[in-house]
Design a protein with these regions (language model features):
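Internal helix-turn-beta structural module
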Residues: 68-143
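Residues in well-ordered beta-strands of folded domains
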Residues: 1-3, 27, 72, 87
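Conserved mixed alpha/beta catalytic, RNA-binding, or beta-rich assembly cores of soluble enzyme
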Residues: 5-68
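Glycine-rich, mobile lid/loop segments that gate access to catalytic sites or pores
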Residues: 1-11, 110, 128-132
């Protein structure tokens, strides 16, 4: 998606007040990052909510396939359609899905992101052993 929202009236820090993202690569571990930084953003921002959704999808796919999985999501701000790509890292198999519906609002409702709990994510990162109580970290058997 290139300039999917049209004309930019404001850009940079004026329109999107995130931080530099230096901690981003650490918090997101070995996953690829597109440069968006979730910190200082609430759950209505795709940088945060769709990363959590991708983590959940990867955990579910990995559990079923018994191998590591990388999930990528492409989206356009303000539109609920996403393109989802799943890569199975051992077999090299790649699947893609078009026309799926997911938005930050849907993820916010799904994961209950309107409740307090962001401080520990900023301290320890959004994934891993310190976040086992979070819905995006649960396995299928935990649900």
């Amino acid at each position: 998606v290139v300039n999917g929202t049209g004309v930019y009236h404001q850009h940079g820090p004026v329109a999107d007040t995130g931080v530099t993202g230096r901690k981003l690569a650490v918090d997101f571990g070995t996953g690829r990052i597109g440069g968006g930084c979730p910190w200082t953003k609430d759950a209505t921002k795709a940088d945060l909510s769709l990363n959590l959704y991708a983590r959940r999808l990867a955990k579910v796919a990995s559990e079923g396939a018994h191998e590591p999985v990388e999930v990528s999501i492409a989206c356009c701000i303000g539109k609920p359609d996403i393109i989802l790509t799943t890569k199975f890292l051992k077999s090299g198999e790649i699947t893609a899905s078009n026309g799926l519906k997911m938005s930050p609002r849907m993820v916010k409702e799904m994961f209950g992101l309107d409740k307090p709990g962001y401080a520990d994510m900023c301290w320890y990162g959004p994934f891993g052993e310190y976040q086992q109580d979070k819905p995006w970290e649960k396995s299928l058997s935990d649900m």
